[in-house]
Amino acid sequence: EQALLQYVSREAARTAMNLLVKRDYAEAELYRKLRDKGYSEFFAGKGIEYVSAYHYLDDARYARQMIGSRKDTTSRKMMVSRMRQKGLSDEVIQEAMEEADWTDEMGLTRELRRRFSSAEQIESLTDKDRQKLIQSLMRKGYGYSDIQHVIRHLDELEEGTIWN
């Protein structure tokens, strides 16, 4: 019986390692994956313990990587939502967000630069197209007031860094 417990524990740890080889996971996400693969709560926990002991699993690092890879295309609000879906704790999320040098205004300017080659293009939009743009940005999680602020100050942004 002891040998069987050790064997299944090793298999759970091996499965966790194989999953982590492909990509990083949040602890809760990896736990769900192990459970989906048929491991009981006990053995899924053993697999998590093993990879955590060797620092292969680190929620804070995972949160920082998520922010680094998505901050150019996602609002802070949307990022927090995605992190919660991955099972990251509010403490880890808050810490990672505080460390990040990132504002929604920066994300909006990057998004506008990606879509338009100059500020004049945005200013020349019809009211209908401007509303479509605003709605599109709001679906990405940006606030209406932030969007209005960035669009209103495009001339300053043009002189600064966005289109230079």
Where are these regions (language model features)?
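An alpha-helical, amphipathic repeat domain used for nucleic-acid recognition
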Residues: 1-164
